A protein has these predicted regions:
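S-adenosyl-L-methionine
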Residues: 2-113, 153-179
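Short alpha-helix immediately C-terminal to the canonical SAM-binding loop
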Residues: 149-150
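A short SAM/SAH-binding and catalytic strip from SAM-dependent methyltransferases
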Residues: 182-198
Length: 275
């Protein structure tokens, strides 16, 4: 079921991107309703639309039939948030989010893998943590930028979904305070843009908490395009870190993101656990 949903999401994304004639800075789509192509829990789908509707980065929406699927197109602008996000010295990547549907799929996979807590590192507007929350995770959203955390607070209040936004430097935060048992960490940074340094720091912190790594998963956002990565493309550019820190790859899924909207390849997300 999940594999076909992912393929259908990629199909409508590519069809939409090929025919999009608008001028919005960012744009993404969410199916209007559950269907055979998108067998999503109706309550969850309603919450995904609520996230977009209550999120100030989106200024317009309209319905469109894409590859035979009724969808809502959301158009937005993240320029101000992007500019604000790059002012922090330890920030590993400017705010450039994955798609809401992609965030849901990733959280769904993590749930199937047995994790109960979701920690979104460099969380932007909190969409992965939000999706974790509606799927029953205890979510924590770690973001260094105060403006983005303010945006998350607004979304929490408007959607009645508290995914625990925290304005803090992920490199300095004491994760033992969260009393994690079976967490999955999502690393918000590509390897060639400082994400490798962020990930290495988070792994060190996981290792510093007694017995935590036994039940911990880490998800990395990778790339399939040589122009973005001059080194090893295997595992989305994360192979060296995966080998160095003795991680096993347990799943890889490629999904639409804001930054691959104009590309024929999607963003690979690599699910790993400690050996």
């Amino acid at each position: 079921m999940l594999d076909s949903l992912v393929q259908n999401l990629i199909k409508i994304k590519q069809d939409f991107a090929k025919n999009y004639s608008g001028s919005a800075h960012i744009q993404e789509i969410i199916p209007s309703q559950a269907s055979d192509s998108f067998p999503i829990d109706k309550t969850h789908l309603k919450q995904l639309h609520a996230f977009a509707e209550k999120n100030p980065i989106y200024f317009n929406s309209f319905e469109e039939i894409i590859s035979g699927v009724s969808c809502i197109v959301y158009e937005g602008d993240i320029n101000d948030y992007w500019l604000n996000s790059i002012k922090h010295g330890s920030s590993c990547q400017p705010f450039y989010p994955t798609w809401i549907m992609s965030a849901y799929v990733m959280a769904f996979i993590a749930k199937k893998l047995g994790y109960s807590e979701l920690v979104d590192i460099g969380s932007g507007d909190g969409r992965i943590a939000f999706c974790g929350n509606i799927l029953g995770f205890t979510s924590y959203s770690i973001e260094i930028d105060d403006v983005l955390v303010g945006l998350q607070d607004t979304i929490c209040a408007q959607t009645n979904q508290n995914f625990n936004p925290r304005c803090t430097d992920a490199l300095e935060f004491d994760y033992s305070k969260l009393n994690l048992k079976t967490p999955v960490f999502f690393i918000g940074g590509l390897p060639q843009m400082g994400g490798d340094l962020l990930a290495a720091s988070i792994i060190e912190k996981i290792n510093s908490i007694v017995n935590l790594k036994i039940n911990t998963g880490i998800v990395f956002a990778g790339t399939n395009t040589q122009r973005q990565l001059s080194g090893n493309l295997s595992n989305g550019g994360w192979s060296n870190l995966i080998e160095e820190h003795h991680l096993d790859v347990i799943d890889t899924v490629s999904l639409p993101t804001i930054w691959t909207f104009d590309q024929l390849v999607e963003t690979p997300y690599i699910f790993t656990k400690f050996k």
